[in-house]
Swiss-Prot record:
It comes from Azospirillum brasilense. The lineage of its organism: Bacteria, Pseudomonadati, Pseudomonadota, Alphaproteobacteria, Rhodospirillales. One of its GO terms (cellular component) is molybdenum-iron nitrogenase complex. Its cofactor is [8Fe-7S] cluster. [8Fe-7S] cluster binds at C77, C102, C159. Binds 1 [8Fe-7S] cluster per heterodimer. It is an enzyme of class 1 (oxidoreductase). This molybdenum-iron protein is part of the nitrogenase complex that catalyzes the key enzymatic reactions in nitrogen fixation. This is Nitrogenase molybdenum-iron protein beta chain. Its EC number is 1.18.6.1. It catalyses: N2 + 8 reduced [2Fe-2S]-[ferredoxin] + 16 ATP + 16 H2O = H2 + 8 oxidized [2Fe-2S]-[ferredoxin] + 2 NH4(+) + 16 ADP + 16 phosphate + 6 H(+). InterPro entries: ChlB/BchB/BchZ (IPR050152), Nase/OxRdtase_comp1 (IPR000510), Nase_comp1_CS (IPR000318), Nase_Mo-Fe_CF_bsu (IPR005976), Nase_Mo-Fe_CF_bsu_N (IPR024564). Ala-194 is present instead of the usual Ser that would serve as a ligand for the 8Fe-7S cluster in the oxidized state.
Amino acid sequence: MSMSHPVSQSADKVIDHFTLFRQPEYKELFERKKTEFEYGPTPTKEVARVSAWTKTEEYKEKNLPVEAVVINPTKACQPIGAMLAAQGFEGTLPFVHGSQGCVSYYRTHLTRHFKEPNSAVSSSMTEDAAVFGGLNNMIDGLQRYALYKPKMIAVLTTCMAEVIGDDLSGFINNAKNKESVPADFPVPFAHTPAFVGSHIVGYDNMIKGVLTHFWGTSENFDTPKNETINLIPGFDGFAVGNNRELKRIAGLFGIQMTILSDVSDNFDTPADGEYRMYDGGTPLEATKEAVHAKATISMQEYCTPQSLQFIKREGPAGRQAYNYPMGVTGTDELLMKLAELSGKPSRGVKLERGRLVDAIADSHTHLHGKRFAVYGDPDFCLGMSKFLMELGAEPVHILSTSGSKKWEKQVQKVLDACRSASSGKAYGAKDLWHLRSLVFTDKVDYIIGNSYGKYLERDTKIPLIRLTYPIFDRHHHHRYPTWGYQGALNVLVRILDRIFEDMDANTNIVGETDYSFDLVR
């Protein structure tokens, strides 16, 4: 196709795509493709009219009850969560019973967030396996144990394997009978159908699967409890920083802690010339012995319900679940529980608390009365909302696609108990298209969420603060904790930086708005 404009790029002049697609020849090309290939292109005025209507109260009343379609949900699929959970155990190779394309997606999703490669294999199911079952794929696939030399293989499933009803337990036993792997080699499994639930359900299923494998084969559940405390982080995009912070805090208290699924090393390997297919992770022996711990703490109640129920039946008598404890109060509650269990309060932690309170006092005038929309996983939304209220801010719209009716009531109770947040409302089983209606009809100052919120930011012109998984378009946030007093300080700084950037952007026109373009904030 000919163009009326000369081509802007040549071998001697390579233009970055940011600039290239703004050149006249590309503008002309895009316009022509729209005219030729879009069936009956809608007039610009009609597009503008409908767009304006979708921002109204009338449209919101039609949009919020919609359940038959989901547009931009705040969740991913079960296998992603299961894969993350599996990679938190020593020398573990996730084995996805399904197609290669699916496992490529799961690996890519995690890699784009953590900026680290992650190892997983597939049983490479194709059309014949979909008809006759995937037993032979499982038998052949588990033989990769000899090539990759893991200490454990954790099996999860895709939609294909679940639709045809493959029996993982039976398949694994058959594979062991065929000597694909030694009979005593650990191969825990979890059924993780991607067409129901979410990544947090998949995480829960895999944690339960691993514990069932080790604890279900323990010889003596009546062994006296030891002084160890188990901790389950839950699905957490900041797991690298948060798990290390939890271990640091445990060290300050002198607590012997077993983190059940510790991905902090596996997703933060150094570039030192040594390739590590498996790095760090919870030792398998410690996982087996965790059944004898004095207590188990879950950092995310809504991310670990089945695991907690299993622990109630089989494991440590003491159980405590939190909702992504952030901020002063959230950290207070966690550390008081640790002090109670260990009998060892730490002065160092008290000093950290005082520094956080001082920082909040220094900056509270910039936070007081600011209105926020928060979306993400159920526990994150709860923890984040509580911290915002501590800062004097107002969480207005709290939304989670994975949120249940129970979660809605819990969030609403928290909001109603705070005068500054009493106008806030929780929305479970809703998506970002619903949130779009909410923020257009009931304005907020900032949105807290993940990278998918950037399209909402562009549409609504409301600044986005990225504080939860996945963060694809920013680098290395996951290395910094959001839990503990130090983590709360990191979150506070992240929020304040966005507020100050917004102030500068709105006061930088010389002679018009720069009267408040201040050097000191």
